């Protein structure tokens, strides 16, 4: 569909293009019904996923792309889907998505891996704006997002995401679906936002606690919490949390309980 455009992927932008519409159709299908939703795509690249989204007739699709070389491709798509497609030439990290789309909103994207985690953390700050996310991550990052306690992948991303959403891994993909082929495997996950957070907690306080404890994840929780409070032993005792546990052993609720005591 874009054979006339010879675009060499830029390594500094983490560009890995998906050429197969069979793959992008499958990813978009994982997002479920999109006909009544505003859809946001990050890093549309050559437009393969863009076409897959537009074929499912969303209320509107807005794509954010940093690489100006891709403008001719997307100008063509804009003309083909008049009124349905908007293209924004910008860095997604600089945009508050609340300013460009009207709810209900779903995000569907093959994220640039170099900024994928930063984007997710940014969106969590206003996650109630979204209905859901269907996102391609590096498999290692996806495994961290969906991890449960007592798992080596469990950490900050797991807790902050799952406080606000149900998370599901939909499919793993090998490097062969991309051009150029990355050195890592990839995964598509669905993040479905809950009507309310699982637990009542001050998010900024929770984030600080989680960040400090998981930065020293091999240390016992009683040791790392002393960087935040002088009442570590009393707090853990009042919550019936053994003080010899490591952060990966604590549930999201236990972290929220600790935050509410500090």
UniProtKB/Swiss-Prot annotation:
Disulfide bonds: none annotated. It catalyses: adenosine(1518)/adenosine(1519) in 16S rRNA + 4 S-adenosyl-L-methionine = N(6)-dimethyladenosine(1518)/N(6)-dimethyladenosine(1519) in 16S rRNA + 4 S-adenosyl-L-homocysteine + 4 H(+). One of its GO terms (cellular component) is cytoplasm. It is found in: Cytoplasm. It comes from the Bacteria. One of its GO terms (molecular function) is RNA binding. S-adenosyl-L-methionine binds at residues 18, 43, 65, 91, 110. Its EC number is 2.1.1.182. Keywords: Cytoplasm, Methyltransferase, RNA-binding, rRNA processing, S-adenosyl-L-methionine, Transferase. Its main location: cytoplasm. CDD domains: AdoMet_MTases (cd02440). Pfam families: RrnaAD. Specifically dimethylates two adjacent adenosines (A1518 and A1519) in the loop of a conserved hairpin near the 3'-end of 16S rRNA in the 30S particle. May play a critical role in biogenesis of 30S subunits. Belongs to the class I-like SAM-binding methyltransferase superfamily. rRNA adenine N(6)-methyltransferase family. RsmA subfamily. PANTHER family: DIMETHYLADENOSINE TRANSFERASE (PTHR11727), DIMETHYLADENOSINE TRANSFERASE-RELATED (PTHR11727:SF7). This is Ribosomal RNA small subunit methyltransferase A. It comes from Ehrlichia ruminantium (strain Gardel). The lineage of its organism: Bacteria, Pseudomonadati, Pseudomonadota, Alphaproteobacteria, Rickettsiales.
